[in-house]
């Protein structure tokens, strides 16, 4: 039997006119599908694929984390930590060989690997552009995720496709002040051998 796993890192930021982060939201999608040695899918792909923030305590990291924090709590702690920093300062956050925080104040609230998030945050800062958001607007990140696939018929490859639709919005009360929409479509081929 085999496993197909797709991991998608999602970051949104707002920055001021000097490139300093004023707000940050971090999320991730981890989509998994199992298949057997005949290349038949074993996973029900009609089941929704929640993001790690949507999973919250159901992700199950809190019970095994050395600090007792769930993934979404650690992602929020990292997001809070980078507010007030530039892209270069985010990239300069000290990490160990596993890219886990090496700075004591961050390591007390974050034990997950952050290297990929550092890069994603810095890229988000570099790509930020004025779209209507104002100081004090609330930044939100929303995803709609799904999987689709086809079995691997004898001698041929099957395919699993993960679709992650993303909207990063800023809001002033009930009014949208800016919106960026993007998507990730990851395709993985497989057969009875893997």
Question: Model-predicted segments: where are they?
Answer:
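Active-site- and interface-proximal helix/loop "cap" or "latch" segments in soluble metabolic
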Residues: 1-194
């Amino acid at each position: 039997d085999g496993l197909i796993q797709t991991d998608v890192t999602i970051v949104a930021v707002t920055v001021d006119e000097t490139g300093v982060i004023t707000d940050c939201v971090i999320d991730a999608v981890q989509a998994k599908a199992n298949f057997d040695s005949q290349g038949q899918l074993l996973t029900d792909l009609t089941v929704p694929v929640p993001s790690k923030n949507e999973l919250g305590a159901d992700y199950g990291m809190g019970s095994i984390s050395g600090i007792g924090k769930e993934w979404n709590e650690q992602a929020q702690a990292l997001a809070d930590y980078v507010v007030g920093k530039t892209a270069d300062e985010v990239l300069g956050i000290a990490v160990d060989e596993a890219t886990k925080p090496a700075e004591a104040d961050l390591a007390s609230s974050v034990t997950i690997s952050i290297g990929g998030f550092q890069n994603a945050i810095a890229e988000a800062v570099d790509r930020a552009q004025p779209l209507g958001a104002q100081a004090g607007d609330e930044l939100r990140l929303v995803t709609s995720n799904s999987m689709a696939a086809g079995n691997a018929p004898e001698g041929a490859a099957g395919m699993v496709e993960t679709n992650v639709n993303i909207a990063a919005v800023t809001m002033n009360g009930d009014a949208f002040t800016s919106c960026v929409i993007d998507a990730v479509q990851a395709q993985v081929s497989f057969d009875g051998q893997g």
